[in-house]
Amino acid sequence: MSIDIDDILAELDRDTTAVEQNASSYPDQSDRTQGNDVSQIRPADKAVDPVAPTQFNKIDDYQKLITHWKNERMSPELLPYPHHLMTRTLIRIQERIELIETLSMGYLEDNQELTVDSKLPLLCMEAELERLKFLVRSFIRCRLSKIDKYSIYLRQQSELPNNAGLSRLDLLMSKEEVKYHMKHSDILLKLFNNAVLKHLPEELQAVNDTEGSISMIDEPDWNKTVFILVCGGVVDESGIDSKLTTDDDGKHCYSVIIEDLNEEIYLLIGAVYVIRYSVIRDLMTEGRVVLI
């Protein structure tokens, strides 16, 4: 299923009025919303759609979205796009907008004149909707800024042999983000070529040269220092966290290796640490730690 990011941002940037406006895993992208507007989804489609909001706890989804937002803002790399979660969230936003419109027009009330007391729940709903919309806007804008920053790096990844790169991009980004990235990188490369590269010797015209002391490709800083909260709680089918261990004091923790120092350290459940991103990247992807 696909969502048009341009439409989303345009919709979310509008001023909210009473007649205009609650809504840690990385699922795959096998199901996406068809069309440019989530309002085009029919009730019959929602009933059989594996990402239908009614089949998931909205509070859990909201907490997952906050976790994705925190990780995206604090991580040096572009993280996998939560396709199913974002689809459910956008559907809930559309449904809540429609509900607020209905309530504000008084269609559900015998007396269609709204009193001060009857407006209070409506105002609370609008406030919660604005909170969710801010979260979605911030999440998408953060991702777009990383796509801009690492444009050449991502393009290089998309050109891996046997379509491995394109498959990776499809998992890493939404369909619209991939299209945005391709168009943006094309414009950027054309600008570089017209302004500078075509005036240089042929052997100096490559923009993806990694030889020499300085790479021309801006890659994520894998050794960036980040703050993390060790949350744990990830279990397999047998109900056991396979990576959970205990330290010398018998406290539950995760063991990680700092390769440069060849040193093993223990991350206690519930504790906060400052550590290199590359050391805890796998734990973050699995949902065992959260960036803060």
From Swiss-Prot:
Record's GO cellular component terms: GINS complex
Chief site of localization: nucleus
Subcellular location: Nucleus
Keywords: Chromosome partition, DNA replication, Nucleus
Tagged with keyword Nucleotide-binding: no
Protein name: DNA replication complex GINS protein SLD5
Gene Ontology terms describing biological process: chromosome segregation; DNA-templated DNA replication; double-strand break repair via break-induced replication
Annotated function: The GINS complex plays an essential role in the initiation of DNA replication. Has a role in chromosome segregation.
Source species, domain of life: Eukaryota
Ranges of compositional bias, category Polar residues: 18-39
UniProt record similarity statement: Belongs to the GINS4/SLD5 family.
InterPro entries found in the cross-reference section: GINS_A, GINS_bundle-like_dom_sf, GINS_Sld5, SLD5_C, Sld5_GINS_A
Subunit composition and interactions: Component of the GINS complex which is a heterotetramer of SLD5, PSF1, PSF2 and PSF3.
Gene3D superfamilies, per database record: 1.20.58.1030
Region (Disordered): 16-46
